[in-house]
């Protein structure tokens, strides 16, 4: 599932190309997605001018001049790409936006777990994104904030940093990578972390996410940016997906365990605490 770096990469690849364009036609191809397409999606975006392209958590948001916004979540396999005027529709294309420069903006989702909605811009934070925690790069993510969130939690720290009500955008890949960089065992209870460990973890999360964004995200199978290019952070993964291989820091064997049904990868030597 695309995480914060992938959505940030998608935003960066689309923003300068979309701002100022007009949506001249909207085609809804099918409605049998997990989150069904609303007919209002077409009427609330048609003939609008694109003002901004931004990200909140794992959501891509496109703001229009009619006080509506488009909210896109890629789900497991979603793609949101720019295509040329002579693009041939593909099997899993669900929404096609014809743009005023002749290009097409395509929402494609093979597994159909993604979502694409239109919503009043001024109500987004109050009614749609209201349960989300703070951004990893926000100045609000401090020792005091995270310590307060962790002090009563007796569940594994990996689960806690993946909780979007606490910190947004840190999915399975980057949680494993961040904990390895911070040298914290993924099973350690949140309320048992020392202050220095919390500070190291905040820094590690930011460092890992920054490197992933610079590399264009992580493509394990489906992810591409708006220009149809994959992410290359896969080549920099230290533990994720490396079960049985040697740790790149100490040469111990990478171990795989399960947390809430998700695979977790760690090094028992580096992550002893």
Swiss-Prot record:
GO terms for molecular function: 8-oxo-7,8-dihydroguanine DNA N-glycosylase activity; class I DNA-(apurinic or apyrimidinic site) endonuclease activity; damaged DNA binding; zinc ion binding. Belongs to the FPG family. It holds the Pfam family zf-FPG_IleRS. PANTHER family: FORMAMIDOPYRIMIDINE-DNA GLYCOSYLASE. Keywords: DNA damage, DNA repair, DNA-binding, Glycosidase, Hydrolase, Lyase, Metal-binding, Multifunctional enzyme, Zinc, Zinc-finger. PROSITE patterns: FPG_CAT (PS51068), ZF_FPG_1 (PS01242), ZF_FPG_2 (PS51066). SUPFAM superfamilies: Glucocorticoid receptor-like (DNA-binding domain), N-terminal domain of MutM-like DNA repair proteins, S13-like H2TH domain. Its cofactor is Zn(2+). Monomer. The active site is at residues 2-3, 58, 262. One of its GO terms (biological process) is base-excision repair. This is Formamidopyrimidine-DNA glycosylase. Involved in base excision repair of DNA damaged by oxidation or by mutagenic agents. Acts as a DNA glycosylase that recognizes and removes damaged bases. Has a preference for oxidized purines, such as 7,8-dihydro-8-oxoguanine (8-oxoG). Has AP (apurinic/apyrimidinic) lyase activity and introduces nicks in the DNA strand. Cleaves the DNA backbone by beta-delta elimination to generate a single-strand break at the site of the removed base with both 3'- and 5'-phosphates. Its EC number is 3.2.2.23, 4.2.99.18. A zinc finger (FPG-type) spans 238-272. DNA binds at residues 92, 111, 153. Binds 1 zinc ion per subunit. It catalyses: Hydrolysis of DNA containing ring-opened 7-methylguanine residues, releasing 2,6-diamino-4-hydroxy-5-(N-methyl)formamidopyrimidine; 2'-deoxyribonucleotide-(2'-deoxyribose 5'-phosphate)-2'-deoxyribonucleotide-DNA = a 3'-end 2'-deoxyribonucleotide-(2,3-dehydro-2,3-deoxyribose 5'-phosphate)-DNA + a 5'-end 5'-phospho-2'-deoxyribonucleoside-DNA + H(+). InterPro entries: DNA_glyclase/AP_lyase_DNA-bd, DNA_glyclase_Znf_dom_DNA_BS, Formamido-pyr_DNA_Glyclase, FPG_cat, MutM-like_N-ter, Ribosomal_uS13-like_H2TH, Znf_DNA_glyclase/AP_lyase, Znf_FPG/IleRS. The lineage of its organism: Bacteria, Pseudomonadati, Pseudomonadota, Alphaproteobacteria, Rickettsiales. It comes from the Bacteria.
């Amino acid at each position: 599932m695309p995480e914060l770096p992938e959505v940030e990469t998608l935003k960066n690849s689309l923003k300068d190309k979309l701002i100022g364009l007009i949506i001249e036609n909207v085609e809804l191809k099918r409605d049998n997605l997990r989150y069904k397409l609303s007919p209002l999606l077409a009427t609330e975006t048609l003939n609008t001018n694109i003002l901004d392209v931004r990200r909140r958590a794992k959501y891509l948001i496109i703001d229009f001049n009619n006080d509506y916004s488009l909210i896109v979540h890629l789900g497991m396999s979603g793609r949101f790409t720019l295509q040329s005027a002579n693009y041939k529709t593909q099997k899993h294309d669900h929404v096609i936006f014809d743009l005023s420069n002749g290009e097409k903006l395509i929402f494609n989702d093979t597994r159909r777990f993604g979502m694409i909605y239109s919503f009043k811009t001024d109500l987004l934070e109050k009614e749609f994104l209201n349960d989300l925690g703070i951004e990893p790069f926000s100045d609000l993510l401090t020792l005091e904030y995270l310590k307060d969130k962790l002090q009563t939690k007796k569940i594994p720290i990996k689960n806690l940093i993946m909780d979007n009500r606490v910190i947004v955008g840190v999915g399975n890949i980057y949680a494993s990578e961040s904990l390895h960089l911070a040298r914290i065992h993924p099973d350690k209870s949140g309320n048992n972390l020392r202050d220095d460990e919390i500070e190291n973890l905040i820094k590690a999360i930011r460092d890992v996410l920054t490197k992933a964004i610079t590399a264009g995200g992580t493509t394990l199978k489906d992810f591409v940016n708006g220009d149809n290019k994959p992410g290359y952070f896969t080549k920099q993964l230290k533990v994720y997906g490396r079960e049985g291989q040697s740790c790149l820091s100490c040469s111990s064997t990478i171990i795989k365990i399960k947390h809430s049904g998700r695979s977790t990868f760690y090094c028992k030597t580096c992550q002893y605490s």
